[in-house]
Each structure stands twice: as C-alpha cells, then as structure tokens.
C-alpha cells in the first residue's frame, strides 16, 4: 500500500483544497493529511486561521479523499510526523516547487507536486 502525505492549515476550506486533495489521493492508496493548527506559531508574519481547528478538522474528515488527519502545531512536529509514519510520497503544491526542502525531509519520502 502506497502512503501519501500532504499538509496545510486548510482555513476556509474551499474547492481548491478539494481539488488538491483529489490530485494527492491519485498518487497513493492511503492519504494522510497534516492539519496545521496555527501557522503563526513558526511564522508570525502569517495570518491566524479564521476557523477553529475543530471546524477545519471536521471539514477535512468529510472529504472522501482523506483517510487520516494528523494535527500539528510546529515545523518540528511536522518533521516528527514525516519521520514517524511510513510515508512513501509527500505531495505538496506546485507553488512550492522552487522552495528548498531539507535533505532530511527529502530522504524520508519522495516529493511530488500537485
């Protein structure tokens, strides 16, 4: 079974999120979604989420492409998820293609762009 992972804050869940999750699910048999609880913890310049974690979790839970949801608060917790779960492919948005990803993260899973 091929396990995929993608993550976001998923604030104000919309059709673009659903399409991204649909594309991510095409690349794996089991899709784990990391739910960032508050992007401002690691990056104060980001906006605080409008919806609560519960609201965002509930919306993700209702999406048929999502098999498991793992909330996380910090980049360190994200790294812990990526190193603790048997992830075969990490799916990230095309807009992140030019960003550097640490070799530690790359060594744990293949990165694919949705």
Enumerate the language-model features and the residues they cover.
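Nucleotidyltransferase catalytic core that binds NTPs
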Residues: 1-103, 107
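Hydrophobic alpha-helical segments, chiefly the membrane-spanning helices
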Residues: 112-114
